[in-house]
Amino acid sequence: YYAMTGLAGADATLFGINEIFGYKTGVFVAFAGYSIFGVGAEVAGITVSKIIAKWFKGKELATAMGVQVALARIGSQAGYAVAIPLARAFGISTPVLLGLVLLLGGMIAFFVFAVMDKKLDKQMEAAAIAAGTEDEEEKFSFKDVKNILVNPGFWLIALLCVLFYSCVFPFQKFASELMIIKYGINENVAGTFAGLPALGALILTPVFGGFIDKRGKSASIMLLGSAMLICVHFIYAIPDINYWLVAIVLMIILGIAFSLVPSAMWPAVAKIFPVSQLGTAYALIFFIQNIGLWGIPTLIGWVLDAYCISGKKPDGTNMYDYTVPMCIFTGIACLSLIVALLLKKADKKYGYKLEEPNIQK
């Protein structure tokens, strides 16, 4: 925010410096702030996942994680919805100021939580002493990393995560243009239809989480979600199917798949690993996921520019044929289905209990 206000001018200086590494000081400080925010966002995601697993293990774990995912989707969509209107009405720095205020609110909420968590730790410690057992919480050890990496369940969950999300998030980046070019949907509403998966995840993830808590079937649900993803991308890849209603129905199905897999996948990590290794496991999974979310959009962008230019728009920018990218997404979705099958097989072999309910009676 400071970079966009106090350092906004072309002649702005910081400690008498006008340029840093060839960039205007304001631009460089904005880069630095955004980078720090990115690191903090990942740390927060890992920490929140670990906290929820700690508080709700053996209880409504999938429901709690589903609510957390839903709230995250609300935040993401709200950011997209209000940023441009705020910038137009009050200036380009206003959305950043709003983000700063929300982050301060989050920090206050964390301090309140820390007090509550300390109380829970004391209760858990007292219960462990009374039961004659040791608390599962331990300090970080590199041995934990080794134990995680040699666990087949880790690699299957991590691969499923990166393959599944690589078929969803990169696709959403150009879904609006696909709606307009292939299906003839008006550009004023194309973005709304492209946002249906996020809306579906917001509503359905807690619902599916509640089902998993009571009935189980996590491995089967991940298998079902991956199969639905294949159907969606395969039909999108067929050139002759270009009716607008088909596109909308496929977006709704994608939203259901986008709810099924996360509602089962993230709580499954808490069944595969003890609490003492959960934070490390989530961190490693997020790390692998981000490699895919960097690599797949890069690949799709290269394919579009190299093989898929179909013409020019009135403003001179390229128009694209998305058949090849959709075939790539279909192939990745097929790989996610194979991994989901292997995970279900591993569940039977290693006794992860993924098919059992989360709520322990």
What are these regions (language model features)?
Residues V27, G33-L71:
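Cytoplasmic helix-loop-helix junction between adjacent transmembrane helices
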Residues S218-M265:
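C-terminal transmembrane helical hairpin of 12-TM major facilitator-type secondary transporters
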Residues D121-I157, I359-K361:
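Juxtamembrane intracellular "pre-TM" segments in multi-pass secondary transporters
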Residues L204-K217, L304:
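Helix-to-loop junctions at the C-terminal end of transmembrane segments
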Residues A62-R88, F286-P297:
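Glycine-rich segments within core transmembrane alpha-helices of 12-TM secondary carriers
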Residues T94-F113, T323-L342:
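Symmetry-related core transmembrane helices of the 12-TM Major Facilitator Superfamily/SLC fold
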Residues Y1-Y23, A227-I241:
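C-terminal ends and interior cores of transmembrane alpha-helices
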Residues N151-T205, P262, I296-P297:
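Extracytoplasmic gate region of multi-pass secondary transporters
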